[in-house]
Amino acid sequence: MTFYNHKAIEPKWQAFWADNHTFKTGTDASKPKFYALDMFPYPSGAGLHVGHPEGYTATDILSRFKRAQGYNVLHPMGWDAFGLPAEQYAMDTGNDPAEFTAENIANFKRQINALGFSYDWDREINTTDPSYYKWTQWIFTKLYEKGLAYEAEVPVNWVEELGTAIANEEVLPDGTSERGGYPVVRKPMRQWMLKITAYAERLLADLEEVDWPESIKDMQRNWIGKSTGANVTFKVKDTDKDFTVFTTRPDTLFGATYAVLAPEHALVDSITTAEQAQAVAEYKRQASLKSDLARTDLAKEKTGVWTGAYAINPVNGKEMPIWIADYVLASYGTGAIMAVPAHDERDWAFAKQFNLEIIPVLEGGNVDEAAYTEDGIHINSDFLDGLDKACAIAKMVAWLEETGVGHEKVSYRLRDWLFSRQRYWGEPIPIIHWEDGTSTAVPEQDLPLVLPVTKDIRPSGTGESPLANLTDWLEVTREDGVKGRRETNTMPQWAGSSWYYLRYIDPHNDEQLADKDLLKQWLPVDIYIGGAEHAVLHLLYARFWHKVLYDLGVVPTKEPFQKLFNQGMILGTSYRDHRGALVATDKVDKRDGSFFHMETGEELEQAPAKMSKSLKNVVNPDDVVEQYGADTLRVYEMFMGPLDASIAWSEEGLEGARKFLDRVYRLITTKEIVAENSGALDKAYHETVKAVTEQIEGMKFNTAIAQLMIFVNAANKEDELYVAYAKGFVQLLAPFAPHLGEELWQILTASGQSISYVAWPTHDDSKLVENDVEIVVQIKGKVKAKLVVAKDLSREELEKVALAHDKIQAEIAGKEVAKVIVVPNKLVNIVVK
């Protein structure tokens, strides 16, 4: 039996593509454009795993398909190479993180090339390259000039073990850091912030303009968290002080019986009575040790301390005790809430715990037993009594504005973006702080501000980055003799990934971020594929920067990514014992189709789980390419199921994909290829062209491959294969299995040219119709024969064909035919005497 040799074919075509610059981005302005973007990887020491190629194969299929359809295709790859692991490695080994990063990139690139992706490597970018981060820094200076980058003393999520502050999004629900699982404490520090809140409304509204999964849009909407309500001002009794509360339910103000301030609220110390001072100070200390997520966990026990002070409810003049509690965050809203315990579960639980008054102001429920959180007619509310929610809110807002104690307000959950990191391995922030108290951005002609090479990258110990140790780099003097100090914080890893898709468009431009005409030609990105784990942060940050650049006139579109697709996760095989505990694969024995724990002998249950080093179920693509070939890996990952589904890896599935490709190879190399078309495969071929084209467009790659299999089965039943159909089929296969596609194309054409730019096959609708039909011939209602006849044969012709059939002749010999009933395209029934 014939098999193809992937170890010979694949390197041969990879070398051909590289030598001939086959995938150089097209620049013919008369052609339509297609920009296919992958979420570029962080080049870790572990290298590529089989999850990476799933998304990469999808964009590659689309890119190859669009090239064949006559598009200019931009399909680039690069490296998101700043990041903590490289710095941690450098601290552990004393090596330069740049060396570690370069080695990892070389390994990633080798692995990616072995999989036959059609990247234009002339456009490769690396976020740690000064010629790249010059423009990351340039964008920062523009943010600074527009007042969108500012310094603030803010409580940050400080991780002692990492020596840095991390963003809220990087804190896990258990209050530890996403990276390393270390404890997170709140600590006030000078930080750079980006004013993403200034773009909240546009970030929300423009989600309507992009073709993204609704689930991802919803995650962004919830993160932005728009709510409409009112700001209400409460005076503090017996003082000239007041505080403001934002509420979405100003109509429940008559039910507000106490107020709660965040422990960090600026008023707390000045209103706390002497009797309560010690308890308040201790509570503030404890709150500072908790992350925002831990503090706002709905399930946690409510804690709080009374300040000894009272607020005055503006609608009824009642005194409301002012408490502090850690579930109120200084960074959210105004850092103060009015509590309406009758109609809010958290306020109700707090009021019950501390024996505070509960006044119902909406009809319905029993507030002695639980908070009533449904809508209802207003009661105990003076001028709002008898009104429904909408009318009551409108009337209360009008009253607040007339009396000068409040006004309508739109609020967002979105916070400004904490942009500094106290680490070495990141882009230096291009700001100089002068001894006269002013700060200035490094001028454009002095960019990039290059990260200095140093052996000493331990944290400085002062909360500043290791750059604070490098005096020569740190200290500067202005022309007028004024001394200054460079900013020591570096940018987060998100910085370089917030605009990289723009640099691919013009990666070697020294004069500007990218040429205006080229940006106009290529934007927006037509398809962006990557993991759903970046649903909020990366995509929100990139959209924010893009909108700033749009306002600056740098980019021509409001949104960067027209269509977004999240591939599913490839799960590993795992085994669980009777307790549900996972057992590493090297501790499992397979016997007669069952699985047993090698040490305990217990029978185990097999189930998919996320691939992890600890379970020893990570599959390395190098091993798959070695054994089965890159084309097999590509076809298998696309055939596993829908692209967005999470599916378990299976060795059997891999073998099935390889067998299919071997059958394709045998079909083209051993079947007689002929110049004359017998017509036998017309329908199968044209159906395949139509279906595969539509399914690639719709990213239904698994059904496209299934259709290719149907054609192979049909072709194998015939003695010969029409050359045009053989070529067309190989073209349809090539985006999925490009090495085999090229090899078979040369066998069929001997052209010496790549298949990549050969025009994509088209189908003929007239060939999709069946020309023949099968009819049954009955005698007295019993089936005696089945005939294949031309479609739409007349009744007379059908009767003639049926009566002339050998089997029927034998059945009716010596009998009189009384009647023949004909149903065209279906049956002939002969009645005999």
From Swiss-Prot:
PROSITE patterns: AA_TRNA_LIGASE_I. One of its GO terms (cellular component) is cytosol. Its EC number is 6.1.1.4. The keyword Aminoacyl-tRNA synthetase applies. A motif ('HIGH' region) lies at residues 41-52. Its main location: cytoplasm. Keywords: Aminoacyl-tRNA synthetase, ATP-binding, Cytoplasm, Ligase, Nucleotide-binding, Protein biosynthesis. It catalyses: tRNA(Leu) + L-leucine + ATP = L-leucyl-tRNA(Leu) + AMP + diphosphate. One of its GO terms (molecular function) is aminoacyl-tRNA deacylase activity. A motif ('KMSKS' region) lies at residues 610-614. GO terms for biological process: leucyl-tRNA aminoacylation. InterPro entries: aa-tRNA-synth_I_CS (IPR001412), aa-tRNA-synth_Ia (IPR002300), Leu-tRNA-ligase (IPR002302), Leu_tRNA-synth_edit (IPR025709), M/V/L/I-tRNA-synth_anticd-bd (IPR013155), Methionyl/Leucyl_tRNA_Synth (IPR015413), Rossmann-like_a/b/a_fold (IPR014729), tRNAsynth_Ia_anticodon-bd (IPR009080). The keyword Transcription regulation does not apply. Pfam families: Anticodon_1, tRNA-synt_1, tRNA-synt_1_2, tRNA-synt_1g. It is found in: Cytoplasm. ATP binds at K613. Belongs to the class-I aminoacyl-tRNA synthetase family. This is Leucine--tRNA ligase.
